[in-house]
């Protein structure tokens, strides 16, 4: 069976927590500081880390067993977020291979941007402090009326880059990332190097499942160069 060649992307969009950056240490520190101030023992890091992509909801759920809408949640959320805002880039770092991958995308002539559900009060200072200041666009969880898995943030990112959604790929480590990307009409990549949460990424129906940032760069490079070769042969 003959299949159409894969169109080359013009931009790669990324989730932030668990995709570009390992922010779990600072998120865990913020929730455990809240516990310490209440005289409670810390929640083990290996329990907190897998929930990092879910932000406050994940941290509070894992540490206190309290969910949004339940009694006490909003007070816990306020305390956690205040702690996090005061120390959001102490231990957070880009994952190994991310800087080289981003440089490689730029060398291929591709734009790249960040689309996260993290609120702008945290996103804006964080991206500057951990080395993501060159992003072509940064869309936070409160930039649009609806966060992911709604497609609106991804569509806004494409608009800001002056690109059609189908010219963009979206890379994330959570099921909602893949749902948002598909709803926006973008090709989707699940990154297995991230936190990934309770549902295994092979069940997310992503177009690609990759283990390393280098694998992403290699895939994009192959697709871009194949498209360039087709243009030359036309």
Put a short name on every predicted segment.
Residues 5-100, 106-108, 121-124, 132:
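N-terminal helical cap/lid subdomain that shapes the substrate entry/recognition surface
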Residues 1-10, 106, 120, 124-234:
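Asp-based, Mg2+/Mn2+-dependent phosphohydrolase catalytic module
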